[in-house]
A protein has these predicted regions:
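Conserved AdoMet/S-adenosylmethionine-binding subsite of the radical SAM
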Residues: 1-127
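Auxiliary Fe-S-binding modules of radical SAM enzymes
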Residues: 110-175
Length: 175
């Protein structure tokens, strides 16, 4: 990633550099990203509570160890929030993507919106879970239903009271 960003910066100096990340290694990367001229980062952050996050992520590989359950979830959340804060302190625009997973993080997303607003993120993009079995994802293969349009609109409305929402995003696999 860093080599690609450096090449782009050298060959296309006027192009805005932005990246998207799950945030697990973000705090350690912020200084390099800022030095390379990255001025916009999107962090996928689906929960700020380890109990909720542990239902989304079975494990993370962090600091040379495979962590599981709430320990994994808390490590991911801590890294995401620390990275978000460091980016803001360095003048980088931060957008947060959250995937709406019915029955798992739907009631929790307003708390996510409040936390990221308090940390300085400028935009929250709540996207519907893509859980079609043919995509081969964990949730798709295990029968997790996707949110319907009414659920998505309702959560975006709830979260919109504390944080600017991005509502023009269409369902895709890009984020």
């Amino acid at each position: 990633t860093f080599a690609s960003l450096e090449r782009r910066r050298r060959t296309l100096p006027d192009v805005k550099l932005c990246i998207s990340t799950n945030g697990l290694a973000l705090p350690q990367a912020v200084d390099s990203l800022v030095e390379l001229g990255v001025d916009h980062v999107t962090i996928t952050l689906n929960a700020i509570d380890a109990h909720v996050s542990a239902q989304i992520y079975d494990w993370v590989y962090f600091d040379g160890q495979r962590l599981r359950g709430k320990e994994a979830a808390q490590a991911l959340i801590d890294q995401q929030m620390e990275g978000l804060q460091k980016l803001i302190e360095n003048g980088v625009l931060v957008k947060v993507n959250s995937v709406l997973i019915p029955g798992i993080n739907d009631a929790h997303l307003p708390s996510v919106s409040e936390a990221i607003r308090s940390s300085g993120a400028f935009l929250h993009n709540i996207m519907p879970l893509i859980a079609k079995p043919e995509h081969g994802t964990f949730f798709g293969l295990n029968g997790q239903r996707e949110p319907d349009q009414q659920e998505l609109a309702h959560i975006r409305e709830l979260c919109g009271s504390s944080m600017t929402q991005m509502s023009h995003c269409q369902q895709c696999r890009a984020d």
